[in-house]
Every structure is written in structure tokens, then in C-alpha cells.
Amino acid sequence: MPRRGGIPKRDVLPDPIYGSKIATKLVNQMMLDGKRGVAEKIIYDAFEIIKEKTGKSPLEVFDAAMKNVMPVLEVKARRVGGANYQVPVEVRAERRQTLGIRWMVLFTRKRAGKSMAEKLAAEIMDAANNTGATVKKREDTHKMAEANKAFAHYRW
């Protein structure tokens, strides 16, 4: 293993329209085959739909949705004496955000019918209202961590 310092973390540039770094991260996660323009169009269209339907700022709604989908705890597999234990660990802030965005995009893609922008807008609005598949995924993750609380002393 190389002994040089760690690789510096590259910071994302804020989104050109909303000036938000988290919106840029959503664009990056949504992007397929390097087609940033397509991903940006989907997200901006989704934000317009949110603005029309809620009458609020789309970034406010998106931030509320992100707060509802970011996990606080998760489980990690740890091998002890030939047995694998699911050990609950706290999620770092950076990973919380990444998981929230990743799950949101995943469940947006799984939604049926309509355009991608409509599906994303619906998923964001559902998450902001504490409903939807993304919020359920977070709750399931927390339940797993709670169920395996007995193995918390195996943390490293």
C-alpha cells in the first residue's frame, strides 16, 4: 500500500441555476453515459413541476426531502470467530447525503410510467411529505440497525 497522504476530496461546483451543491450532486447521480445536459434538463424540469404543484421554492422542498431520506444508522458486516454479524454504525455526514441521493435516483427510476422529470418530482414531493419508497428504504435501514443493536459492541 502506498504511504503517501490520502487523495484530496474534490469539491463539486454549485449548480448554475440554483447555486446549490446538493443539486449538482443529484445531477451527477442522475447522469448516465456522461450526458450531463440530459440529467440537468430532467432535474430542472422536475424542479419546475415541484414549483407548480407546491407553490414553494423547489430547493426548499428538495432540502426537506433530503432530510427525510438521509440515514443516521446503517449496518456493516463484521466477521468475528467464523460468524458474520451485522454491526450497526453511525453514518458520516458525507455518506448520508450520498446514500440519500443514490436511493432517491434508484427509486425514481423504478417508478412506473410518465417522464423521468415527473417521476423525480413525485419522488421528491413524496419524500418531503415523509412518504414514498425512498423514505421506506431509510426506515428499513434504521430497523435493521435497531434489530442488530446487540452487536453494537463489535464496532471498530
Curated annotation (Swiss-Prot):
The gene is rpsG. Belongs to the universal ribosomal protein uS7 family. One of the primary rRNA binding proteins, it binds directly to 16S rRNA where it nucleates assembly of the head domain of the 30S subunit. Is located at the subunit interface close to the decoding center, probably blocks exit of the E-site tRNA. PROSITE patterns: RIBOSOMAL_S7 (PS00052). One of its GO terms (cellular component) is small ribosomal subunit. GO terms for biological process: translation. Keywords: Ribonucleoprotein, Ribosomal protein, RNA-binding, rRNA-binding, tRNA-binding. This is Small ribosomal subunit protein uS7. GO terms for molecular function: rRNA binding; structural constituent of ribosome; tRNA binding. It comes from Desulforamulus reducens (strain ATCC BAA-1160 / DSM 100696 / MI-1) (Desulfotomaculum reducens). It comes from the Bacteria. InterPro entries: Ribosomal_uS7, Ribosomal_uS7_bac/org-type, Ribosomal_uS7_CS, Ribosomal_uS7_dom, Ribosomal_uS7_dom_sf. Part of the 30S ribosomal subunit. Contacts proteins S9 and S11. Signal peptide: none annotated. Pfam families: Ribosomal_S7. Transmembrane segments: none annotated.
